[in-house]
Amino acid sequence: MSTDKSPYAAFSALLASSGRDRSPAELHGQLLGRSCAGAGFEVDAWLADAADLLGGQIPDNVRQALIGLQEMVKGELTGGEVAVVLLLPSDEAPLAERAAALGQWCQGFLGGFGLAAGDRPLSAEAMEVLQDLAAISQVQSALEDSEEGEGAYMEVMEYLRVAPLLLFTECAGPVAPAPKPSVH
């Protein structure tokens, strides 16, 4: 019996309890990809994309979790962060499970980015990042459960924490901060 209390495990359990057979990593990747491509942070548009990925109507508890996930992503992308937090299994999970989730995250990111970006021209640097993500999405079975495999996983994960910011800067540009209520 797993005692993993990570956000990934909690989100995974929530999805499973609602009959959804999707990885939290893939959902997070899709959200981050669409956001980085300039889709914006409008909740209903994100929920519609998530419903398509999840195969239909979203139960309220999953809906609330998806809204929370979007708020987290919006804060990371617009708050001057130097890296994003990836929704992946904890370090205690077997390397094969973490590598598979990393691949799912990349697949979700590419799907979300592609839907939102359309045929927009991209810089050579942005194209290279997308090509890297496509290559990483295929890596899950290539990592061996060893110190070397662990090191390669960590290196790829660190790259993925900063790569989305390049794409966001190029495609989405600056987002106006939410208006603060005036105090009278």
UniProtKB/Swiss-Prot annotation:
SUPFAM superfamilies: YgfB-like (SSF101327). It comes from Azotobacter vinelandii (strain DJ / ATCC BAA-1303). Coiled coil: none annotated. It comes from the Bacteria. This is UPF0149 protein Avin_47340. It holds the Pfam family UPF0149. One of its GO terms (cellular component) is cytosol. Belongs to the UPF0149 family.
